[in-house]
Design a protein with these regions (language model features):
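Signature aromatic-anchored transmembrane alpha helix within multi-pass, membrane-resident enzymes
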Residues: 1-18
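Transmembrane signal-anchor/signal-peptide helices with a preference for the extracytoplasmic
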Residues: 15-34
């Protein structure tokens, strides 16, 4: 009877510590996506999401590395068409939007145009239209 109670208390303590540890990791998006990458280093989405959060933290060089890695991983031949389309489009759209923020409109459009024509995803088409509009406004 006592052994059972000790076991229950021990399990409760272990689970409590694990919960606190996980809450800490999830309390900041960078910790969350780094953990996701540790668990699934060959998936493009965690790399893309980590890059997006680096952008929010104004760490552009880390964001660019993450978006480029996400693109490479998404292009792996073992991925389905939908995985490739989504992974490449999202990462390249993020890179193009970053370039547009820097005023590099031609470079951003050159990056997006082939992706837009190949995969035809709405967010890429919308980003292309937005960058084109920003370029027009900037040139006036």
């Amino acid at each position: 009877m006592i052994v059972g109670k000790v076991l229950v208390v021990a399990l409760f303590l272990v689970w409590s510590v694990a919960t606190v540890n996980q809450v800490f990791r999830w309390s900041h998006p960078l910790h969350l996506w780094r953990q996701a990458i540790e668990e699934s280093p060959n998936k493009p989405r965690p790399w893309n999401n980590l890059g997006a959060h680096y952008l929010l933290d104004r760490a552009e060089h880390f964001a660019i590395d993450c978006f480029q890695r996400s693109t490479r991983l998404a292009q792996h031949p073992d991925r389905s068409y939908n995985e490739r389309a989504s992974g490449v489009s999202v990462a390249q759209t993020n890179l193009a939007l970053l370039e547009a923020q820097r005023g590099e409109y031609d470079r951003a459009l050159a990056r997006l145009t082939p992706v837009m024509h190949l995969y035809k995803l709405q967010e890429t088409i919308a980003a292309h239209a937005w960058i084109t509009r920003q370029k027009t406004i900037a040139s006036q």
